[in-house]
Amino acid sequence: MPYIPHTPEELQEMLSVVGVRDLDGLFADIPPEMRPKQFNLPKGQSEAAVCAYFEGLAAKNCPDLVSFLGAGYYAHDIPKAVDALAGRSEFYTSYTPYQPECSQGTLQAIFEFQTAISRLLGMDCANASVYDGGTAIFEAAMMAVRSTRRRVLVVDEAVNPIWRVMLASYISSLDLELKTVQQEKGVSRLDALMAAIDDTTAAVIVQNPNFFGAVADYTQVFAKARAHKAFGVISVYPVMQSVLKTPGEMGADVAVAEGQSIGMPLSFGGPYLGLMTCRKEHIRQFPGRIVGRTTDVDGKTGYVLTLQAREQHIRRAKATSNICSNQALCALRALIHLSLLGPCGLTRLAENNMALTRYAVERLTSIKGIELLNDAPYGNEVALRLPMPAQMLVDALSAHGCVPGYPLGRYYPGMEDVLLLACTERNSRQQIGMLAETVGGLL
């Protein structure tokens, strides 16, 4: 049976209101040669057939694999209270409320989220979230372009390649220049980044730890950017922020992150969470919702959407961004997750994962032919050079129920023999030992 709620009479009534005769008239502005002649879609199926099809797709997943995958998305333990609280009907929406008098609980939760993220990254202000880490980098770049009225973006090649592709796609029709500074053996070249900054630069964009897991201090890079009145933008890994120098301490203008690691399970395509923070002086160029705390006429504390003149529903085409609804439910999960861990718990988590990674490096580099790609400091993720193609190792071990890491040759030509390995609290020393023994046996 069809699940179309409108009768033919209702459809005709709607068409007459907009002034067209039929459905084709709605698309008259699109030239016929630009319209698809047919869609490569299967014929309609019964409910049972559709369920069977998707169950077959789901059965291809391998939830029992021992995984050392990272590359920007990480398998962390999530307290059960996160699901229990975020799943309450009062919160279960991605939409930001416009009517503060009806939604004080949701607004306060977003305000507390902003406070937590600002403190975690050491920055002045945070927004209510954007879609994901890649979107956050683009929005930060556009903040810089609007503020500086410049067209050149300097990007470190060691920034997550997925996010760099997203950035390039977003700006492809905006007459902006993307200037990529090459990494060297997985290490960001700070001197080259500083040399690339001049009076035409809108922003310099870096990542810490970078995609290869290498940790660096970008204070001098941001100082050079500020000297040329350009923005310093940095993407970070939230869990590692409890033990690393914060973006605020480095002097960043905008700090962003993929928030999946704090409260979101791994999922193909999301939903994930884009974190955005900035210095107070840039807040009027900030995209998305911002919740503020105020006092009403009776002296009671209240929470409201503030600085709305930046937004699409007010400024329309002149808004700072076309983002409307944000990832409010994912932001709530992140807030609950951080609150349950607390500052000490988050620090212990990062230290535990770093210790596991050091142990993995110790075991694997004791195997002949395996070595660190570089001698840079690392956190819970590290690049290893192998005596064989990394993809071959991944394929061989996956057949035995273990994914040893990510083959970097997929994104970086010439690094076909480099494996990116990450450890979280979901891994154990026993699993690392089994990984080392299996790899040693194959080599």
UniProtKB/Swiss-Prot annotation:
It catalyses: N(6)-[(R)-lipoyl]-L-lysyl-[glycine-cleavage complex H protein] + glycine + H(+) = N(6)-[(R)-S(8)-aminomethyldihydrolipoyl]-L-lysyl-[glycine-cleavage complex H protein] + CO2. One of its GO terms (biological process) is glycine decarboxylation via glycine cleavage system. Keywords: Oxidoreductase. GO terms for molecular function: glycine dehydrogenase (decarboxylating) activity. InterPro entries: GcvPA, GDC-P_N, PyrdxlP-dep_Trfase, PyrdxlP-dep_Trfase_major, PyrdxlP-dep_Trfase_small. The keyword Glycosyltransferase does not apply. Its EC number is 1.4.4.2. Gene3D superfamilies: Aspartate Aminotransferase, domain 1, Type I PLP-dependent aspartate aminotransferase-like (Major domain). Belongs to the GcvP family. N-terminal subunit subfamily. The glycine cleavage system is composed of four proteins: P, T, L and H. In this organism, the P 'protein' is a heterodimer of two subunits. The glycine cleavage system catalyzes the degradation of glycine. The P protein binds the alpha-amino group of glycine through its pyridoxal phosphate cofactor; CO(2) is released and the remaining methylamine moiety is then transferred to the lipoamide cofactor of the H protein. This is Probable glycine dehydrogenase (decarboxylating) subunit 1. It comes from Desulfovibrio desulfuricans (strain ATCC 27774 / DSM 6949 / MB). The lineage of its organism: Bacteria, Pseudomonadati, Thermodesulfobacteriota, Desulfovibrionia, Desulfovibrionales.
